[in-house]
Amino acid sequence: MIEVGDYKVKEGLYYTKDHEWVQVLDDGTVLVGISDYAQKELGDLAYVELPEVGTEVNKGDVLCELESVKAVSEVYAPVSGEIVEVNEELEDSPEVLNEDPYEHWIAKIKPSNLDEELKELMDAEAYAKYLESL
């Protein structure tokens, strides 16, 4: 784990400038979640509007919405592909994203262009440097 001020950055993941993370699984699918920075900026999460399984998303599309006590925020798809699973635990317990944003994912995507799109994401070290610039 890399620490940048009050924020933690988990190594072994890829990150976007919008503070989503991507974990590539052995079967070629990816898990998508939000970073520690994102959950702290949002504050206490009250509701997660999960995407529909089977939906095709393009990189940059809205993946879901998170409602916190402060605001409603959109989470963007960091890669293109088909949503094959959502974390239904978040429907009843959205606060788990605040408690441990790296253990709790939002959606699993079967990517359609992973090799190219991963090149556009940051590794943990690059993301930590990005956070330092904010």
Residue ranges of predicted features:
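Mid-chain, well-packed structural core segment of small domains
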Residues: 66-102
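Short, well-ordered turn and helix-capping elements at secondary-structure junctions
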Residues: 34-38, 61, 70, 87-90, ...
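Acidic, low-complexity mobile loops and tails
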Residues: 1-59, 99-115, 120-134
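Short, well-structured beta-strand-loop connectors
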Residues: 52-66, 82-84
